[in-house]
C-alpha cells in the first residue's frame, strides 16, 4: 500500500513539474518577443555553462594562480599597485599574448604615456595595436564602450583610472571643488559596460593607482582611485608590489630588473588570495623562463639538489640564474616544459575548481 502511495506521489510531482515547465516556456516565448532571442536561457543549453575562455598572462605561474589559464574573457579586471611596480608591463604582456593568438587589442592611454619602443620590446606588434589618447574620462569610457559593442576587440587596456578626468573638472577652475565626479563617472560607465562585455567576449583591464586615506589610524590606509564601483564590478583584482631589485651577477649597483609579487585579492572565476612572484627584466618584460623553472620545480618536472638543477638524469646547470639563461637559449626545451606543465596544472585545476564551486553553493 505504501509503495502505491509513493508511486502516486511521484506521478503527481511529475505532473506538477510538467505544468511548471509549460508555464515557464510560455513566459520565455513572451520574454523573447519583448526583449529578443536569448533573453532567457538555461545555462546547460548555452555557452555560459561551458567554461570561461582566457587570455594568457605570459607567465605560467600567474596563469596557474589565476585558475583558468589566464585572464578571463568577457570580464572586468583591475590591476593596481604603487608606481613602477609592473602594472603596465603586465597589461602589455597580455596584449602580446593576444596578438600571438591572432587577436586584436586596444590601448586607451588616458595618461598619454605609452612607450611604443618598450611595448615592442615586450613582444607587442605596435603596428597592429589600436591606440586612443582621449582628452576626458567620458571620452575614454565611451570609446571603450564602442569597441566592446563592435565585438571585434579581444582585449582593451585602460591606463589609468586615476587619469580618467571628468569633463566638468577639466572645464572648471583649478580651485573648484569637484567631489565624487570621477566616482560617479566610473559607476555610470561600468554599469553600461558590464552588460555588454560577456556578449562580446572582450576582456577589459583597468590599471589603477594607490591613494592614501587621510585620518585612518587603524587598518590599511591604502585605497584605489575612482571610488568603489570598479572594486564591485571587477571579476579579478590583482595587487602588484615590487619586492626587490635584480642586479647583474657580480655587481651590486647594476640593476637589470625587479622581482614583483602579484596577489589576487578578488577572483570570481577561481579560488582567490593566491600569490606569485614574477621576474621583470628592464626592456624585456616578464621572464617566461623563470616562471617555467618555478612551475617545473613545484610540479617536480625539474629537481634541485643543492645548487644544481636537473631534468631527469640531465643536469641543466648550477644556480637559478644559469638555468634561466639555459632555458632562454633552449627555446624548444622551454616550450616543451611549458606544454607539459599546462597539461599537468590545468587537469588538476579542473577538479579543484569544481570543488570550489560546490563549496560556494553550499
Swiss-Prot record:
GO terms, molecular function: ATP binding; ATP hydrolysis activity; ATP-dependent DNA damage sensor activity; damaged DNA binding; single-stranded DNA binding
GO biological process: DNA recombination; DNA repair; SOS response
SUPFAM superfamilies assigned: P-loop containing nucleoside triphosphate hydrolases, RecA protein, C-terminal domain
Residues that bind ATP: 81-88
Name of the molecule in the record: Protein RecA
Assigned protein family: Belongs to the RecA family.
Subcellular location: Cytoplasm
InterPro entries hit by this protein: AAA+_ATPase, DNA_recomb/repair_RecA, DNA_recomb/repair_RecA_CS, P-loop_NTPase, RecA-like_C, RecA-like_N, RecA_ATP-bd, RecA_C_sf
GO cellular component: cytosol
Pfam families (alphabetical): RecA, RecA_C
Keywords on record: ATP-binding, Cytoplasm, DNA damage, DNA recombination, DNA repair, DNA-binding, Nucleotide-binding, SOS response
NCBIfam families: tigrfam_recA
Described function: Can catalyze the hydrolysis of ATP in the presence of single-stranded DNA, the ATP-dependent uptake of single-stranded DNA by duplex DNA, and the ATP-dependent hybridization of homologous single-stranded DNAs. It interacts with LexA causing its activation and leading to its autocatalytic cleavage.
